[in-house]
Amino acid sequence: MNLKNANYSGANGRNSLIDLEIPEEFNGEIIIFIHGFMGFKDWGAWNLVQQFFVQQNYGFCKFNTSHNGGTADNGIDFPDPESFGNNTYSKEIEDLQLVVQWLNDKVENWNG
């Protein structure tokens, strides 16, 4: 399974982008990668990090937090600075909880 720029519903019901890659020889473990307070899922070397872990048979999920300044249509260019201004750590924790629920709906046989 390989989902790129899929949508999940994050904090306050705000849609954001998520990637999920499950290798053929999946070991049942998924790494959930969180980019940090001022970042996004496709910044820098994060795709290389994903590739490394998938080659080790881990599933890999990375996502934009719902209030990182990106949108579901444009996750990179910071088109919504107002949402970023309303971001909190609590919203990012809620996003993580919602991503785990999203994974439970998408992936069978993982140890989450």
Task: Mark where each language-model region is.
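A residue-identity detector for tryptophan
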Residues: 8, 43-46, 60, 102, ...
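General structural feature for long, well-ordered alpha-helical segments within catalytic domains
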Residues: 22, 45, 92-95
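Short, surface-exposed "cap/lid" segments of acyl-processing enzymes
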Residues: 24-70, 74, 78
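Alpha/beta-hydrolase active-site loop
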Residues: 82-111
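N-terminal cap/lid segment of alpha/beta-hydrolase-fold proteins
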Residues: 1-26
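Residue-level recognition of the N-termini of beta-strands and the immediately preceding loop/turn
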Residues: 30, 111-112
